[in-house]
Amino acid sequence: MDLLLINGPNLNLVGKREPSIYGSQTLEDIQAELLTLASELDAKLKFFQSNSEGEMIDCIQKSVGSIDGILINAGAYTHTSIALRDALLGVAIPYVEVHLSNIYSREEFRHKSFLSDKALGLVCGFGANSYQLALEGIVSYLKRV
């Protein structure tokens, strides 16, 4: 099973940016833990991070035929990007939306997600563990279908 984790804008700063909200682990630390978990779950996990909406869309489109499931933390694009939504729907690859913080306990403008209503699921608010929970969820789903 081949999976892709896409991280959007400013997630390259995790561990440095607002640690009281996003935690102190770096994206590299989180990814290292996820690789271990993916191996335990008999899954392969690739990573992509970009601050550019267009690059994220290109990555999604290029994953057709090689990726079975997507984990996506679109960062601020979660709340603004119909284009990301359309790309995810266009490739018809199952995806799980993931966020480090609970987007529904933050500013009101963060309460709207253009991705969650079509996602397999949404995991948010558990810090770095949100990624692990999302990974376990999508692997469980893909093993059943």
Swiss-Prot record:
The keyword Zinc-finger does not apply. The keyword Iron-sulfur does not apply. InterPro entries: DHquinase_II, DHquinase_II_sf. The active site is at residues 22, 99. Transmembrane segments: none annotated. It is an enzyme of class 4 (lyase). One of its GO terms (biological process) is aromatic amino acid family biosynthetic process. Substrate binds at residues 73, 79, 86, 100-101, 110. Keywords: Amino-acid biosynthesis, Aromatic amino acid biosynthesis, Lyase. The record marks 17 as: Transition state stabilizer. Pathway: Metabolic intermediate biosynthesis; chorismate biosynthesis; chorismate from D-erythrose 4-phosphate and phosphoenolpyruvate: step 3/7. It comes from the Bacteria. Its EC number is 4.2.1.10. It catalyses: 3-dehydroquinate = 3-dehydroshikimate + H2O. GO terms for molecular function: 3-dehydroquinate dehydratase activity. Coiled coil: none annotated. SUPFAM superfamilies: Type II 3-dehydroquinate dehydratase (SSF52304). Pfam families: DHquinase_II. Homododecamer. Catalyzes a trans-dehydration via an enolate intermediate. NCBIfam families: aroQ, PRK05395.1-1, PRK05395.1-2, PRK05395.1-3, PRK05395.1-4. Belongs to the type-II 3-dehydroquinase family. This is 3-dehydroquinate dehydratase.
